């Protein structure tokens, strides 16, 4: 084998730059790390050769990556945000959560899940401050054969009508506002009351936000409800449901929307039913959506 072809001679030549770097990993005793770094090295060198950046452009890229790291802290992960806006987070999620035919699709978890949300009786209202447009959420948890799943744990959370989660507005929203955990009975059905969520921006006051603006992109996520659905014997489902009429439904900043996750948000003009549900405005939003769990 020609050492010049494989890069094993150790000398740097532009035409075989990636091969020279990859050859230095011959003594790596972690095969997975070796595989990953070989692919990353090859693709990065391919990109640099295609782009042919100036030295000034390369230093600008280095400074951007430095700023991304510097803004991270215990509650802010700008690297994840960077991955999100490039669609990489969704791609990793899709690869790791491929579903059998008929099972509900997953999407990214998001940064605002709270592990100790309270378990609530079926039908409870998770909107604790009474603000926003009333909403009734119903549906079933099924297996891929259409059989109801009893004992399914449904962890749900959402932003309020101004686009904020409770953890973003300590002292303004009550703790655990618009969060709750529900457990299905034998019929697999769930229902709860809430407030219609609104679209909101991802954090855009840092380097990732600057990059979005430079690319001519907005920072908004369309209105959605988060779900984690788990049951014994089934794969846990992390997903959302989205309002198809949201202005940002086709341009989610983090690419989290899949067509199967669109739900039907219906405005119900029924004063009697609204009163029965404890809604004071004489009308409400209704959304019915089933989730299908895979084993």
From Swiss-Prot:
Residues the entry annotates as binding Fe cation: 165, 200, 224, 226
Record-linked SUPFAM superfamilies: Aromatic compound dioxygenase
Superkingdom of the source species: Bacteria
Details of cofactor binding: Binds 1 Fe(3+) ion per subunit.
Reactions this protein catalyses: benzene-1,2,4-triol + O2 = maleylacetate + 2 H(+)
Paired cysteines (S-S): none
Keyword Oxidoreductase on entry: yes
Cofactor: Fe(3+)
InterPro entries on file: 1_2-HQD/HQD (IPR039390), Catechol_dOase_N (IPR007535), Intradiol_dOase_C (IPR000627), Intradiol_dOase_core (IPR015889), Intradiol_RC_Dioxygenase (IPR050770)
Enzyme class: oxidoreductase
Induction: Induced in the presence of gamma-resorcylate.
Segments crossing the lipid bilayer: none
EC number: 1.13.11.37
Keyword Hydrolase attributed: no
PROSITE patterns the record matches: INTRADIOL_DIOXYGENAS (PS00083)
GO terms, molecular function: catechol 1,2-dioxygenase activity; ferric iron binding
Keywords: Dioxygenase, Iron, Metal-binding, Oxidoreductase
GO process annotations (BP): catechol-containing compound metabolic process
Pathway annotation: Aromatic compound metabolism
Family: Belongs to the intradiol ring-cleavage dioxygenase family.
Function: Involved in the gamma-resorcylate (2,6-dihydroxybenzoate) catabolism. Catalyzes the conversion of hydroxyquinol to malelylacetate.
Designated name of the protein: Hydroxyquinol 1,2-dioxygenase
Name of the encoding gene: graB
């Amino acid at each position: 084998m020609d050492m010049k072809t494989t890069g094993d001679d150790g000398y740097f030549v532009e035409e075989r730059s990636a091969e020279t770097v990859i050859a230095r990993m011959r003594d790596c005793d972690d095969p997975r790390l070796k595989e990953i770094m070989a692919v990353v090295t090859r693709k990065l060198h391919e990109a640099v050769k295609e782009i042919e950046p100036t030295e000034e452009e390369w230093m600008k890229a280095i400074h951007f990556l430095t700023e991304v790291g510097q803004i991270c802290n215990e509650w802010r992960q700008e690297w994840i945000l960077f991955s999100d806006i490039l669609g990489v987070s969704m791609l990793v999620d899709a690869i790791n959560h491929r579903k059998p035919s008929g099972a509900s699709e997953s999407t990214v978890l998001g940064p605002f899940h709270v592990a100790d949300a309270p378990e609530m009786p079926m039908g409870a209202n998770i909107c604790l401050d009474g603000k926003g447009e009333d909403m009734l959420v119903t549906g079933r948890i099924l297996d891929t054969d259409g059989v109801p799943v009893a004992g399914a744990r449904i962890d749900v959370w959402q932003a309020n009508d101004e686009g904020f989660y409770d953890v973003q507005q300590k002292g303004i929203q009550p703790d655990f506002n618009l969060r709750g955990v529900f457990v299905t009975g034998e019929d697999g059905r769930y229902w709860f009351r809430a407030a219609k969520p609104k679209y909101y921006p991802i954090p855009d006051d840092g380097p990732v936000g600057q990059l979005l603006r430079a690319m001519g992109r907005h920072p908004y996520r369309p209105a959605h409800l988060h779900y984690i659905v788990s049951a014994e014997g089934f794969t846990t489902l992390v997903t959302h449901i989205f309002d198809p009429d949201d202005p940002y439904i086709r341009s989610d900043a983090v690419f989290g929307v899949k067509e199967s996750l669109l739900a039907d948000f219906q405005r119900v003009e029924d004063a009697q039913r609204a009163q029965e549900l404890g809604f004071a405005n004489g009308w409400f939003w209704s959304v019915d959506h089933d989730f299908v769990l895979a084993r």
